[in-house]
């Protein structure tokens, strides 16, 4: 993820990293790096982005923990996790109001 993974530059939307306690920020950054390293696919959505997650690189409970932090600093995101049957693909959808798609696309560039 670009920047700090919470706040894409040049976007009309802004996250508040201060919403995550100072004591929790190291864990947040650790999880953010794990999420970024686990992305194995991307799919544009009308109002956001879906990212395919390699669960060999990040466990589902850790993905959920990262989402809990993101909900604090970026409350304008909507999250959905789709788990396919028979150990199929895991997709995390990040969507929201106008501008969120561009914000998320920039955050997950690369």
Where do the model's predicted regions map?
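Secretory/periplasmic and organellar redox-cofactor proteins
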Residues: 1-61, 80-110
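Amphipathic, interaction-prone secondary-structure segments
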Residues: 60-64, 68
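A common structural junction motif
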Residues: 68-77, 108-110
């Amino acid at each position: 993820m670009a920047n700090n993974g919470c706040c894409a530059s040049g976007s009309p939307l802004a996250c508040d990293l201060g919403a995550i306690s100072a004591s929790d920020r190291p864990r947040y950054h650790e999880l953010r790096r794990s999420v970024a390293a686990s992305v194995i696919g991307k799919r544009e959505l009308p109002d956001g982005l879906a990212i395919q997650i390699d669960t060999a690189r990040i466990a589902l409970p850790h993905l959920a923990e990262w989402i809990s932090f993101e909900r604090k600093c970026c409350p304008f995101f909507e999250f959905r996790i789709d788990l396919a049957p028979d150990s199929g693909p895991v997709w995390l959808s990040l969507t929201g109001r106008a501008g969120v798609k561009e914000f998320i696309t920039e955050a997950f560039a690369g």
